[in-house]
Amino acid sequence: MTYFRINPVLALLLLLTAIAAALPFISYAPNRLVSGEGRHLWQLWPQTIWMLVGVGCAWLTACFIPGKKGSICALILAQFVFVLLVWGAGKAATQLAQNGSALARTSLGSGFWLAAALALLACSDAIRRISTHPLWRWLLHMQIAIIPLWLLYSGTLNDLSLMKEYANRQDVFDDALAQHLTLLFGAVLPALVIGVPLGIWCYFSTARQGAIFSLLNVIQTVPSVALFGLLIAPLAALVTAFPWLGTLGIAGTGMTPALIALVLYALLPLVRGVVVGLNQIPRDVLESARAMGMSGAQRFLHVQLPLALPVFLRSLRVVMVQTVGMAVIAALIGAGGFGALVFQGLLSSAIDLVLLGVIPVIVLAVLTDALFDLLIALLKVKRND
């Protein structure tokens, strides 16, 4: 008797995507401040119901194809669905813009967001099954964005309300990007300068680890908004006592308290990553290095540091992603960044303006995480070789 094995993950994603097709694909509103009316795919293009049925049948068939061939088919179909969703959203916005007023806005609906997320999850699951090599996985993930980026730069998506917000605020967006990157690297670099030596010191001075980690744990538990607020008064008093600090850009609000707070939040993962990375090295390895005649400095530079590097990079990845997200809150004290767009959108009830600030933050976090994943995986491959 022949048994068919089905890919349960792909089948579940297919079911959820079918449910997403029943939700509004886009939302159409007469202006940016009014709640939009949901439009389904079959309302926009009645003939698309047959395309959806065809794609669903092909996707279902891929669930039963065994091995790598099935995964490749699943990747192609899921990527096709994602590209089709992006292209369809742009075409729907253009179609509605031709029939509506210049103030009308076409936003992405819940059906689009859910279906796109599920298609990307299906792509990720298929890539995981296709290859185990980190570089190939990374390249397969990156190629998913090629066609959507081409659609973006070709102008296909220009009539979406999100793109209209970008066109109206391009200078503000560029400034926000520069400020957000300044917050990111301006916090991570000093944190590295402080955290790495502090972690090494804690490793060699185990008696002091408890006090250091207790202090850093307390800092980590303070809510970000509270810590930003606590730094305003001392910094303002410092600038009042020493006015020349103001010429250096130091103030009670703005970048200075934001950078100090972000550095403080970054210290615990970095210090702990250094200590854990050095502690996980087997003692047999250190004894072998000592037996070879290596000095303490040589053992640290040529044995301990390379072996601890993957663990440290994982901690640095956490810090980078954490800082990308927390920099959004820094806009509350005038530090700028994408958080300024988010809070402006919330205050004016403009969801598309909120998305204009949120989406780049998500993209930065995902890219940062992907780059560190690739680097860590390549280090493991090199070590195994």
UniProtKB/Swiss-Prot annotation:
<feature type="transmembrane region" description="Helical">
    <location>
        <begin position="181"/>
        <end position="201"/>
    </location>
</feature>
<feature type="transmembrane region" description="Helical">
    <location>
        <begin position="138"/>
        <end position="158"/>
    </location>
</feature>
<protein>
    <recommendedName>
        <fullName>Glycine betaine uptake system permease protein YehY</fullName>
    </recommendedName>
</protein>
<feature type="domain" description="ABC transmembrane type-1">
    <location>
        <begin position="177"/>
        <end position="372"/>
    </location>
</feature>
<keyword id="KW-0997">Cell inner membrane</keyword>
<dbReference type="GO" id="GO:0031460">
    <property type="term" value="P:glycine betaine transport"/>
</dbReference>
<feature type="topological domain" description="Periplasmic">
    <location>
        <begin position="246"/>
        <end position="247"/>
    </location>
</feature>
<dbReference type="GO" id="GO:0055085">
    <property type="term" value="P:transmembrane transport"/>
</dbReference>
<dbReference type="GO" id="GO:0016020">
    <property type="term" value="C:membrane"/>
</dbReference>
<feature type="transmembrane region" description="Helical">
    <location>
        <begin position="248"/>
        <end position="268"/>
    </location>
</feature>
<comment type="similarity">
    <text>Belongs to the binding-protein-dependent transport system permease family. CysTW subfamily.</text>
</comment>
<keyword id="KW-0813">Transport</keyword>
<feature type="transmembrane region" description="Helical">
    <location>
        <begin position="107"/>
        <end position="127"/>
    </location>
</feature>
<keyword id="KW-0029">Amino-acid transport</keyword>
<dbReference type="GO" id="GO:0015838">
    <property type="term" value="P:amino-acid betaine transport"/>
</dbReference>
<keyword id="KW-0812">Transmembrane</keyword>
<feature type="transmembrane region" description="Helical">
    <location>
        <begin position="70"/>
        <end position="90"/>
    </location>
</feature>
<feature type="topological domain" description="Cytoplasmic">
    <location>
        <begin position="367"/>
        <end position="385"/>
    </location>
</feature>
<dbReference type="Pfam" id="PF00528">
    <property type="entry name" value="BPD_transp_1"/>
</dbReference>
<feature type="transmembrane region" description="Helical">
    <location>
        <begin position="6"/>
        <end position="26"/>
    </location>
</feature>
<dbReference type="GO" id="GO:0005886">
    <property type="term" value="C:plasma membrane"/>
</dbReference>
<feature type="topological domain" description="Cytoplasmic">
    <location>
        <begin position="66"/>
        <end position="69"/>
    </location>
</feature>
<feature type="transmembrane region" description="Helical">
    <location>
        <begin position="323"/>
        <end position="343"/>
    </location>
</feature>
<keyword id="KW-0472">Membrane</keyword>
<comment type="subunit">
    <text>The complex is composed of two ATP-binding proteins (YehX), two transmembrane proteins (YehW and YehY) and a solute-binding protein (YehZ).</text>
</comment>
<dbReference type="GO" id="GO:0006865">
    <property type="term" value="P:amino acid transport"/>
</dbReference>
<feature type="topological domain" description="Periplasmic">
    <location>
        <begin position="344"/>
        <end position="345"/>
    </location>
</feature>
<dbReference type="InterPro" id="IPR051204">
    <property type="entry name" value="ABC_transp_perm/SBD"/>
</dbReference>
<keyword id="KW-1003">Cell membrane</keyword>
<feature type="transmembrane region" description="Helical">
    <location>
        <begin position="45"/>
        <end position="65"/>
    </location>
</feature>
<feature type="topological domain" description="Periplasmic">
    <location>
        <begin position="27"/>
        <end position="44"/>
    </location>
</feature>
<keyword id="KW-1133">Transmembrane helix</keyword>
<feature type="topological domain" description="Cytoplasmic">
    <location>
        <begin position="128"/>
        <end position="137"/>
    </location>
</feature>
<feature type="topological domain" description="Cytoplasmic">
    <location>
        <begin position="1"/>
        <end position="5"/>
    </location>
</feature>
<feature type="topological domain" description="Cytoplasmic">
    <location>
        <begin position="269"/>
        <end position="322"/>
    </location>
</feature>
<feature type="topological domain" description="Cytoplasmic">
    <location>
        <begin position="202"/>
        <end position="224"/>
    </location>
</feature>
<dbReference type="InterPro" id="IPR035906">
    <property type="entry name" value="MetI-like_sf"/>
</dbReference>
<feature type="transmembrane region" description="Helical">
    <location>
        <begin position="346"/>
        <end position="366"/>
    </location>
</feature>
<dbReference type="InterPro" id="IPR000515">
    <property type="entry name" value="MetI-like"/>
</dbReference>
<feature type="transmembrane region" description="Helical">
    <location>
        <begin position="225"/>
        <end position="245"/>
    </location>
</feature>
<comment type="function">
    <text>Part of an ABC transporter complex involved in low-affinity glycine betaine uptake. Probably responsible for the translocation of the substrate across the membrane.</text>
</comment>
<dbReference type="GO" id="GO:0055052">
    <property type="term" value="C:ATP-binding cassette (ABC) transporter complex, substrate-binding subunit-containing"/>
</dbReference>
